[in-house]
Regions:
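Radical SAM/AdoMet-radical enzyme domain recognition
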Residues: 1-80
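Iron-sulfur cluster-binding electron-transfer modules in prokaryotic oxidoreductases
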Residues: 51-69, 91, 104-108, 113-114, ...
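Residues that line or immediately flank small-molecule/substrate-binding pockets and catalytic motifs
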Residues: 64, 199, 208
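C-terminal accessory region of radical SAM enzymes
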Residues: 82-119, 145-196, 202
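Short, basic/aromatic recognition patches
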Residues: 117-131
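Short, small/polar residue-rich loop motifs at catalytic or cofactor-binding pockets
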Residues: 131-135, 156
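Short, acidic, Ser/Thr-enriched surface-loop or helix-capping motifs
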Residues: 140-141
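Short cysteine/histidine-rich metal-coordination sites, predominantly Zn2+-binding motifs
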Residues: 208-214
Length: 214
């Protein structure tokens, strides 16, 4: 675990993360961990689950490492579509365990298993109804830029800056987040265009679609 983590992040970051989690638990502060899954760490999920459980972590989000940032330089690390099924199975088999698992927006959508995983996390009915970026949620970056989703870093999709305009005016502008607010199933291609969930799903996670298909 340490070798894989430090190779992806930087040397020493694994032990620093463990130390931080222990300190937070000692002070009764809830913790959540996010793992971006790639071909190098997908085989370590079980070991990581046990470690996080022992550390008293409250929840664990599993997501796919997408070809953006430094990861774009390592396309060979991107998992295959069939690997997603094994991730869903892993999370499903952990329902009822000490550690709550949630599947990120880039995994799943309409299999019975991934629905059960997210319902278990939310303790409520759950159903994917398309990407909510710019429709139900927005993000504020470190420099004040307003984006529909903090994972999408294309500067052409920045809707404004909180230092220059009010959040209300940015949100209510008809020009903001048009790429997703006006998105419909006619813009989908390939299997997504033919899927029976097309109208409801709208192609899944926008960032996944953007990173992989452009």
């Amino acid at each position: 675990l340490e070798k894989t983590h430090d190779f992806i992040r930087r040397s020493g970051s694994f032990n620093k993360s463990i130390k931080a989690l222990k300190e937070l638990r000692k002070n009764n502060i809830s913790t959540s961990v996010i793992t971006s899954i790639n071909k190098e760490n997908i085989c370590e999920l079980e070991e990581l689950y046990q470690l996080l459980s022992d550390l008293g972590v409250n929840s664990w989000q599993l997501q796919i490492a997408l070809p953006m940032g430094n990861f774009a330089k390592r396309p060979e690390w991107l998992i295959e579509p069939q690997d997603i099924l094994s991730i869903i199975d892993f999370a499903y088999n952990k329902i009822g365990g000490k550690l709550l698992i949630v599947l990120a927006d880039c995994i799943g959508y309409y299999s019975n298993k991934d629905i059960k995983v997210n319902e278990n996390f939310l303790n409520d009915n759950w159903s994917w109804t398309g990407c909510g970026a710019g429709k139900h949620v927005i993000g504020i970056l470190h420099n004040g830029d307003i984006v529909a989703c903090t994972s999408i870093r294309d500067k052409t999709l920045v809707a404004g800056n909180i230092r220059e305009k009010s959040l209300k005016s940015i949100w209510e502008s008809p020009d903001s987040f048009k790429w997703n607010r006006n998105f419909d199933s006619s813009k989908l291609k390939g299997f997504c265009r033919e899927c029976r969930y097309t109208e409801r799903c709208l192609g899944g996670c926008s960032n996944s679609r953007y990173c992989i298909n452009g």
